[in-house]
Swiss-Prot record:
This is Probable transcriptional regulatory protein glr2507. Keywords: Cytoplasm, DNA-binding, Transcription, Transcription regulation. GO terms for molecular function: DNA binding. Disulfide bonds: none annotated. GO terms for biological process: regulation of DNA-templated transcription. It is found in: Cytoplasm. InterPro entries: Integrase-like_N, TACO1_YebC-like_2nd/3rd_dom, TACO1_YebC_N, Transcrip_reg_TACO1-like, Transcrip_reg_TACO1-like_dom3, YebC-like.
């Protein structure tokens, strides 16, 4: 999809995460706690935990913090009782938004989300109001450049549904069924590809293109403010912005 802002927005998100390192560390720790609680403390038999640890190490989360999060998740030491909750809503121009949260206080999380939506031209909706517009997919992000022929062979071996290459050759996203993510990452690593990230993500069936810079700015501001909330792990939306529009916003 050359000419669109997908990769530019990924790079902007990485830069924003670097600035908010403290918040990122907290999110990584929560994910390790929840992954341990759901699948046990042994990463060899808990793929989600293994991914969480790899992401934490890549972000330079100290080893003692990683172990402490595992201990909290396993009950070896006392910790907060986080639960995973999905929230749904609408942004400006009818953009559908899914929020994945990990919280120890539902009332606080809902109040924070509702405040951000209402202040930025959106509405927090009921469960199911936009979820039907998305599908859960496994996504493996590879460092570029890559040889496309080799990528296709490894991706097919791992059960991939498709792939998308950064127009500038700086990365590749390979998608699969959520349940096939472990097999896909194993196949890609086995073929010698460098894995930058892997996660299960909500992917929209269709996108709303935002050609008006003012509307696009309002939507992006809403998404950024949602992402900045302490309890929010990930935000997915069905918006699409041309590179030229994005550049005019962040120039």
């Amino acid at each position: 999809m050359a000419g669109h802002s997908k990769w530019a927005q990924i790079k902007r998100q990485k830069a924003k995460n670097d600035v908010a390192k403290g918040a990122m560390f907290a999110r990584l720790s929560r994910e390790i706690i929840v992954a341990t609680r759901l699948g046990g403390p042994d990463p060899a038999g808990n793929f989600r935990l293994r991914l969480a640890i790899e992401q934490a190490k890549a972000a330079s989360l100290p080893g003692e913090n990683i172990q402490r999060a595992i201990d909290k998740g396993s009950g070896a030491i006392e910790g907060d009782n986080f639960e995973e909750i999905r929230y749904e809503g609408y942004g400006p121009a009818g953009v559908a938004i899914l929020i994945e949260a990990q919280t120890d206080n539902r009332n606080r999380t809902v109040a924070d989300l509702r405040a951000v939506f209402s202040r930025n031209g959106g509405n927090l909706g009921e469960t199911g109001c936009v979820g039907w517009m998305f599908q859960q997919r496994g996504v493996a992000v590879l460092e570029g450049p890559v040889r496309e022929e080799e990528l296709i062979e490894a991706a097919l071996d791992g059960g991939a549904l498709g792939y998308e290459i950064d127009p500038q050759g700086q990365g590749v996203e390979v998608t699969c069924e959520a349940a096939d993510l472990e097999a896909l990452t194993d196949a890609l690593k086995g073929a010698g590809f460098r894995l930058a990230a892997a996660e299960v993500r909500w992917v929209p069936d269709n996108n709303i293109e935002l050609a008006d810079p003012d509307v696009a700015r309002q939507v992006l501001t809403l998404l950024e403010k949602l992402e900045s909330l302490d309890d929010v792990q990930r935000v997915s939306a069905n918006h699409l912005v041309e590179d030229a529009v994005l550049e005019s916003i962040y120039a």
